[in-house]
Structures are given as structure tokens and as C-alpha cells.
Regions:
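Signature of uroporphyrinogen-III synthase
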Residues: 1-231
Length: 231
């Protein structure tokens, strides 16, 4: 199947390799550019660290990792935990599939920690709102949406050459739908099967045929894709 990937450019290569190994034809359509933001570690005695996106580590120096090496890490997703282990093999990591699951785990410890939250400039504020006053946000990156879909993407959709689109977040799904409308492609999206990594990611896709992964992981996203293959 020809599968459109809407991930950030820094994430897309690994996903394309996995799709190719499964016998699909991956087509890259990165919707975001990940850029650094100026930051420094606040002068405060933090006792735990929160990460909800692996991109929070994209511009972290080795020196920064050394300064936070003794903190327990609360994180979302295997990519985040893999990065932590790569830099700090003996780190104490508490990992969850989603931010809401992570928040449930954090709330058990909230009164005994002062949290440093490594995050992006654009983010949902649920964690910050619910953990006040025990949390300080440190913005380490920005994810800037592109202005238009690529010419290749537009032409492939118009010619019905795309059979499936993978959506990795609510924001990426919203961005794709908006850019597709801008390119005059809205009616064409009904001929494509969409797969969302979560119910939240599926929200902007209600007008189109959409399946949702059973868990918010790329592996489960690919499981849905495999189930759609012609027998």
C-alpha cells in the first residue's frame, strides 16, 4: 500500500524504514519543522523531571544530562525512555503510553516532588494546570507547521495514488486537514483510509474513513495498517 507519513522530518526516516520492511510504499510528508529554543536550567531545586515528547531532548547537551542525571524521569513513549537510557543508563524511569496515563502516575507522587517539565513551545497545558504549584516548564524546542502540502503530495492525492495516511497526533491531523482544504483536496480525503494513533488524534478526521490504534504507539498504528492490506 502507498502510505503517507505526516511526521516531523526528524522522525520520519525510521518510520519509513519500518513501513518498507512491512512491504508498503512510504511517502514522506513532514508537516512540522523542529527548531531549538534558547533555554537554560532554572536555578531551582528540582526533584523529578517530566517529558511528554522525545523532541524535548533534541537540543539537550551532554552537560545538561549530567546536571539532571540523579532525577527520576516521568515520560511518555518508548522513544523518550530510549533517549534517557542512552545518555543515563542507570536512570530511574517511569513511563506511560499517554500524557493522561502519566499524569495519573505523577499525581501519586506530586506532594513529594518539585517537577521540571521539558516541553515544546506549542503544547497542551493539562499537566501544568494539574500539577501547579509543583511544576516549572522549560521550553526546549518549537514545532513549526509548514504552510502548504508538497506538490508531490497534492498530485498523488488528486490521482488517488495514496491508499492510507498515518496521523501521529491531534495537531498533525488538524494541520493536514487544514492544508488539504487549502489545496482543494477535502473531497479527495474520503477516498483514503486514515489511521490515527489515538482518539484525540482522530478528532479532526471525523468526516473521513478513520481507524484508531488500540494503543497510542507506532507499533499499534502499523497493526491497523497491516489489517487493511488486501488478502
Amino acid at each position: 500500500m502507498r502510505v503517507l507519513l505526516t511526521r516531523a522530518i526528524s522522525d520520519i526516516k525510521d518510520s519509513m524504514n519500518k513501513l518498507s520492511s512491512l512491504g508498503h510504499i512510504p511517502i514522506a510528508e513532514p508537516l512540522f519543522k523542529i527548531k531549538p529554543r534558547p533555554f537554560s536550567l532554572p536555578d531551582k531545586n528540582f526533584t523529578a523531571l517530566i517529558v511528554t515528547s522525545a523532541h524535548a531532548f533534541d537540543f539537550i547537551s551532554d552537560e545538561f544530562f549530567v546536571r539532571i542525571k540523579d532525577l527520576p524521569f516521568y515520560c511518555v513513549g518508548s522513544r523518550s525512555s530510549d533517549i534517557i537510557v542512552r545518555h543515563l543508563p542507570h536512570a530511574h524511569i517511569i513511563c506511560a503510553y499517554t500524557s493522561s496515563e502519566l499524569l495519573s502516575l505523577i499525581k501519586k507522587d506530586v506532594n513529594r516532588h518539585e517537577f521540571l517539565y521539558l516541553c515544546g513551545y506549542i503544547r497542551k497545558k493539562d499537566i501544568e494546570h494539574q500539577l501547579q504549584p509543583h511544576i516549572t516548564a522549560l521550553e526546549t524546542y518549537d514545532s513549526e507547521a509548514v504552510d502548504t502540502l508538497s506538490t508531490q503530495c497534492v498530485e498523488l492525492i488528486k490521482k488517488q495514488k495514496i491508499e492510507c495516511i498515518l496521523h501521529y497526533s491531534q495537531r498533525s491531523a488538524e494541520t493536514f486537514v487544514r492544508l488539504a482544504e487549502k489545496a482543494g483536496l477535502t473531497s479527495h480525503l474520503s477516498y483514503i483510509h486514515h489511521i490515527a494513533i489515538s482518539e484525540n488524534a482522530a478528532q479532526p478526521l471525523k468526516s473521513f474513513p478513520t481507524s484508531i490504534a488500540r494503543q497510542p504507539t507506532e507499533q499499534c498504528l502499523f497493526e491497523v495498517l497491516q489489517s487493511l492490506r488486501p488478502s
